[in-house]
């Protein structure tokens, strides 16, 4: 049994992905079925596998923490793409062109004192 591991991050979410081969196509997130855990964001994590036209011969075990469901699903997608690149270096080109290996570094900006939010100032009155 071969195992490839990679980490993906997005906003506050961190996902540690392990892809095991050979497998039965099981995908677990925090020991829960991925479809049940991610609900509407489930299709997002399968995109790297669909791009490479890989069938369900792998088991994928994922540990996530932080962030919301969308951030976690994007972190999982990045982790899966990185693990697939470790598995076979020829996968790198199609995954890179599809944008699955790009780390989105946007994070929430902190609130500053004297302001209502990160950039929103209280209403200005001249008189």
From Swiss-Prot:
Q: Where mainly found?
A: plastid
Q: Does the keyword Ribonucleoprotein apply?
A: yes
- SUPFAM superfamilies this protein is in? Ribosomal protein S5 domain 2-like (SSF54211)
Per the record, the GO terms for biological process are: translation
Cellular component per GO? chloroplast; small ribosomal subunit
InterPro entries on file: Ribosomal_Su5_D2-typ_SF, Ribosomal_uS9, Ribosomal_uS9_bac/plastid, Ribosomal_uS9_CS, Ribsml_uS5_D2-typ_fold_subgr
Q: Which PROSITE patterns match?
A: RIBOSOMAL_S9
Q: Where's it found, cell-wise?
A: Plastid, Chloroplast
The GO terms describing molecular function are:
RNA binding; structural constituent of ribosome
Arranged from A to Z, the UniProt key words for this protein are: Chloroplast, Plastid, Ribonucleoprotein, Ribosomal protein
Q: List the disulfide bonds.
A: none
Signal peptide extent: none
The protein's superkingdom reads: Eukaryota
Q: Write out the similarity annotation.
A: Belongs to the universal ribosomal protein uS9 family.
Please give the name of this protein.
Small ribosomal subunit protein uS9c
């Amino acid at each position: 049994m071969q195992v490839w591991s990679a980490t993906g991050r997005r906003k506050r979410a961190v996902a540690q992905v392990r892809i095991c081969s050979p497998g039965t196509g099981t995908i677990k997130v925090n020991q829960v079925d991925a479809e049940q855990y991610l609900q509407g964001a489930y299709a997002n994590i399968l995109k790297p596998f669909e791009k490479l036209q890989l069938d369900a011969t792998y088991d994928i075990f994922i540990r996530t923490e932080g962030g919301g469901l969308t951030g976690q699903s994007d972190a999982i997608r990045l982790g899966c793409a990185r693990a697939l690149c470790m598995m076979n270096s020829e996968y790198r080109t199609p995954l890179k062109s599809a944008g699955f290996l790009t780390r989105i570094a946007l994070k929430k900006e902190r609130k500053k004192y004297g302001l209502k939010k990160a950039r929103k100032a209280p209403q200005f009155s001249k008189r």
